[in-house]
Every structure is written in structure tokens, then in C-alpha cells.
Amino acid sequence: MKAVQLKRKTNGWALQAFGMQPLVPQTIVDGTIMDQGAVSEAIRQLWSRLKLRQKEVAIAIAGHSVIIKKIAVPMMKPEELAANIRNEAEHHIPFGRDDVEIDYHVTNPMTASGQTELLLVAAKKEVVSDYIQVVRDANLSPQVVDVAAFASQNGFEANYQLDPRDTVVLINIGAAISNINIVRSGVSLFTRDVTIGGNAFTEEIQKQMGIAADEAEAYKVGGSQTEDGVVPQEVLRVMEGVSEVMAGEFQRSLDFFLATTADANVTRIVLAGGSSKVTSLHRAIERRSRLPLEVADAWKRVEIDPQLDRNYLSAHSPEALIGVGLSMRSGGDK
């Protein structure tokens, strides 16, 4: 779990606070909260440790309970679209329309065929309600519930000057879910959540090496070595195997996008999240995609408070991208 607090400045944003709080394994599974009390307590501990006074927050959700689709609807006035969006959504989502929260963003108000193109987002009400409740139980006030893929996009676009011709594959690697978002000119062309993340490295190292979870996690991030200062070859072999599986999942999504999208000229891949610095994963992705790859810097254009630990911020910059995107949101915006 991460918290980011930004302050708007005349020429951009300034970072006031950043921190992370570990969650007990299986507390959240595929984006669904399994232990609400544990999540609320983790939020309280994080707020206390960072000495945060801000009560109004934005949060992100992901997983199979969230559906994002690009659809076309008959052109109509904005107020008519708002009134009819649930009827339109019913044709495109696998959930009952009364069981979901729905939002949308118009990407093209009028196509050549006289239709309106938009991104439709639907999330199960019970999942949204659970996330809102754990935040309230931590004595905070949720103002925005965003989608993780879009929050990472917001954080990325705030930090990078993009050529309108660039088509970027933005992949945020979470603990158990990775968010894939293909973006051009500020518009999301394709999104998909895949149920593989950084935990796959930890779990496989633990299984193959017969060691405790915390030691396996240390090996994953390069913090546990032999007496000679060398990561065991067995660990490297396991990391490479998981990297191949993960890269294969990402490539299948990219292949689907390329096969179904006209003018799909992808220019690069940008990784974010806790496992974005795993070098064997870089090699596996680059070999499959044949595209240049870089790791996101969430603080690239963010002013840093001199009292904050720059080494800590640098080490965890890729993990903060979603938090940066969320911290730029405010209640009532779109």
C-alpha cells in the first residue's frame, strides 16, 4: 500500500509526503478485499507514520471486478448520454447494470459515421463499496475512486513530454495484478489487467529454494546475497523463469492490440511498479516485443521537499506512479 501527497504549484506539483505500508499476504486477492480490518489498520498506521493531516483521498481499484471497454454509441447531447449510459452499458458488460458503478469518458464526440466514441468503465458495486468502507474505517474521506490503469497514465503523462505520434505501452506491475494501458495523445487505446505480478517472483523463489517469504522477497529485490556478495545462481534461474512467464502474458495483450487496431504503431514500453526494475524481466520483454523499454520515474517533473529522503524516493519511484496520478485528482473532476 502506498500514499502520495502532492501540492499544486504554479508551474507543476510538489511532493510533500510518500510512504508504503506492507499488507499481510491474501489481504487483497485479485483486487477484492478479503480482510477489511487489516486494510483499515494498515491505512491508519501509514497515516500515523507519515504524520498526514489530509483526510480527503483518492483511491484506485483493479482486477476482474473492473471492466473497461471502448465503445461507440449514437451521437447525442451530453445530458442525453449521461441519462442513457446505463442502457448502452448493458450491451457491453458481463454484469447486471444494477450491480455495477458506471462511468465514461468521451474520446471522440463525432466519428465519420456520426457516432460518439467513449471509454466505458464499470466496477462491481460491492467491490467499490468495500474499498470506500475501509478508507472510512481509517477515518478518511474518499473523494475519488479511480481505475489503477488510468491513475498510472495520469502520473506518467504529468512527468513526461510525449510526442503526439508516440504510442506507449504502460505496464504497472503490482503485487498480484499488472495493469496494461496503451496510450496515444492522452487517450487510452487499450487496457487489460492480468493476474500476475511481483508476488510471482517471491512465491517461486520461496518454493524452489525452500526459504521463508521475507528472505525470498529480499532475494527478489537484490537485498539478500551470499557471503561473497553474490545472488545464488538458483535464484537467478528462478527469476528468469518467472520473467519469461510474465513477459509472455504482457506480449499476448500487446499482440491482441496490434491485431485489432489500425495504425497501431507502438513506439516503446514503460514499466512501473515494484518489480519494474527486475533486469531479467527487462530482457524477456525486450526480446519478445522488440521495443525499447524504460522504467518510469514518478518524480521526474515533481518538485521534492528537501526534508524528504531522496535515496528512498529514488529507490521506490516506479512504485509511486499510481499514487502520483491519484494525488492529482480532486472530488468532482473527470
Please state what every model-predicted region is.
Residues 207, 218-268, 275, 322:
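Adenine-nucleotide phosphate-binding core of ATP-dependent small-molecule kinases
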Residues 1-18, 59, 110-218, 246:
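Small-residue (GG/TT-enriched) beta-loop-alpha framework at ligand/catalytic clefts
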Residues 242, 264-294, 298-300:
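Glycine-rich phosphate-binding loops at beta-strand->alpha-helix junctions
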Residues 56, 60-160, 268, 298-305, ...:
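Active-site neighborhood for divalent-cation/phosphate handling
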Residues 1-88, 129-131, 137-141:
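Non-catalytic, solvent-exposed interaction/assembly segments
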Residues 154, 276, 294-334:
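Glycine-rich phosphate-binding/hydrolytic loop that grips phosphoryl groups
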